[in-house]
Each structure stands twice: as C-alpha cells, then as structure tokens.
Amino acid sequence: MYKRQDEVCEWLNNLGITAVLLKYRVPRREGLEKHEAPLQDVQRAIGYVRANAENLNIDPKRIGVMGFSAGGHLAAMVSNNFLKRTYPAIDATDKVSCRPDYCLLVYPAYLDGENFQLAPELKVSSATPPTMLIQAEDDKSYINSSIFYYYALKEAGVSAWMHLYSQGGHGYGLRDTGCLLYTSDAADEGL
C-alpha cells in the first residue's frame, strides 16, 4: 500500500492533510554533535511551513510531524527540542515556533538509550505535543523505543496513544505486509 515517502504524502493528501516531505541531513556530520544536523533541518522546516502557512493555505496551529524508524527519532527530537533553535537565526522564519502541534511515530528507532532508559536527547515534558505511536511487537530491535517513549509521555501528562500490533517487524511503511497490520487505519484514526 504505502512504503515510499511520496506515497505517504499522497495518503495524507487523500485525508485532506497537506504533507511536506523533508529530506534531512544524516546525523553524523563532521563538526556537529551526533543529532544536530537533522534537528536543525526539521526545526527550520517546521518554522518555514508555519511562517508561510497563509501562502500554503494551511492552519499554522495544526502543523504536525511524522516519522518512520530513524525519522521517528527525529520527529521525537523536535517534539522535545523546540524552545531554542540549534543554529543561529537566518531570517524571520527562525523566530517562528518550530514546535509541532502533534506527532505520529511509526516504528520509531533509537528512542531508548543504555540500561533500558529513554535516550538522553529526549527531554519529555508537559509541553511535548500529543503523540501517537504505531509499533509491532516482533520488531525486536526497536520495540523498547516505543514503550519507553510512551511511558515517558504518560508520566509527563502528554496525550499519547500507542497501537501495538503482534506482527509486522520493522520497515513496513504503511503497506500491507500480509500480517495483521492496519497501520494506515490506526493513523487515520489518530489524525
């Protein structure tokens, strides 16, 4: 059904949601902290979309972020790192809030750190936006990411939903993999 990013954008458009696809820099860039480059990119993108909401004919108070796997980590990062830009202001766009109004994470990766704890770069607070997580139990590498993040959201009083499926593994996008997965239906419900 949906695996490529442009297909996900098309699915969102069919729901009446304007989708913006961000191609971000990979985390490891010489001279930058591990997660700094992609966080800069998503902060700038959300600020840009919000600053240009009128021209894009969208509601600036309904800008969300969605990510799959490592993109889920990036979406969670911007959901918790929005008070201060991670780069010097370029123009007026960087004075506009880069806080997403909601967050959808599909089989997010890297949300847990060592010793079964939430990754240190994720400082969940009551200001973290409402979040929906979609995860398969048989995703052995990253199921803890969703579980730890979900509990952190709940502890902070953030509205959070988690759809946990028994099968699906990792990397299925929104396609029907032959398993009992209704990811797009769950996401439709959450959006």
Task: For each feature predicted by the language model, list its residue ranges.
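Catalytic nucleophile-loop/oxyanion-hole region of alpha/beta-hydrolase
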Residues: 24-56, 178
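Short amphipathic alpha-helix adjacent to the substrate-entry channel of hydrolases
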Residues: 4-20
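Catalytic histidine neighborhood in serine/cysteine hydrolases
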Residues: 154-171
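Primarily recognizes the serine-hydrolase "nucleophile elbow" in alpha/beta-hydrolase
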Residues: 44-120
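Short, proline-enriched alpha-helix->beta-strand connector loops that line the catalytic pocket
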Residues: 97-101, 126-131
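Short beta-strand/loop motif that positions the catalytic acidic residue
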Residues: 133-135
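Conserved alpha/beta-hydrolase "acid-adjacent" motif
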Residues: 140-145
